[in-house]
Amino acid sequence: MKIVVLGAAAGGGLPQWNCGCVNCSDARAGRLRPSGQSSLAVSADGSRWSILNASPDIRQQMQDRSVLHPQGLRGSPVASVLVTNGDIDHIAGLLSLREQTPFDLFATAGIHEVLEGNRIFDALARDKVARRPVALESPFALHDGLEAMLFAVPGKVPLFMEGESVDTGLIGEQTVGVRLSDGRNTAYYIPGCAYVPDDLLHRLSDAGHLLFDGTLWDDDEMIRSGTGIKTGRRMGHIPISGPDGSLVRLAGLAADKTYIHINNTNPVWRAGSAERAELARRGWQVAHDGLEIVL
């Protein structure tokens, strides 16, 4: 199995269009590697590929990876797209894939309802793009030789669907993780997770590689930096640090581990930071656009 990180950043990317924080400023100045928004490509054979989350940057992300280029006049090696929630940074890129080339669109019924509720996604011609609802805990083929299974993780509804009160620990079809298997190796992709319950730890025990939500280092990172008014947990993302952060909660896993979906404010972007060094000591790497993982 081969996994290619198309985008390592959280919503907005790095640099974010309206942000002058030190990370964004350094990314603009060439002192820090820019990053597109959260997306993966995965393949069992290096020929047919599936996209996990279609970010707003998907056209450029596919252009940057020759394995995703058309092999003829019209067409694509992309057999399917899977989305793990209804967030803008995971579904907006679907609109760039509307050019009459067939692929399967996998998501839970709940996430498909989000797409059905916005007619702009009717631009994906239904005679070309098959919308395939997937039940939780039910394995299915993303493409030949590559099996996926969706499972619920704690999260919330998309920002544009929030009401006056928001439950950030919902467990259901609105936020899912993905188990990937080629019959020999297993990887997990969880770009959004509000907290790590014990049953999730048990599930991940067979992971060969884990790509996990690395949105914020500190829960109040955006508030302290002056770039936002919400904590990570309010946004449905567990922080990396802290006594019940993901670094502590996932410490016992034997898998190789990669943080992905990283906010522009996160200090782990900086190779020389104390936070990056701490991750390395704990057996984690930080994703970057173009990172290749082979299992």
Swiss-Prot record:
Keyword terms: PQQ biosynthesis, Transport
One GO term (biological process): pyrroloquinoline quinone biosynthetic process
Pathway assigned in UniProt: Cofactor biosynthesis; pyrroloquinoline quinone biosynthesis
Keyword Methyltransferase: no
InterPro entries attached to this UniProt entry: Metallo-B-lactamas, PQQ_synth_PqqB, RibonucZ/Hydroxyglut_hydro
Highest rank taxon of the organism: Bacteria
Transport recorded as keyword: yes
Family the entry assigns: Belongs to the PqqB family.
UniProt function note: May be involved in the transport of PQQ or its precursor to the periplasm, in association with PQQ biosynthesis, but is not absolutely required for this synthesis.
Official protein name in the record: Coenzyme PQQ synthesis protein B
Organism this protein belongs to: Ruegeria pomeroyi (strain ATCC 700808 / DSM 15171 / DSS-3)
Gene name of the record: pqqB
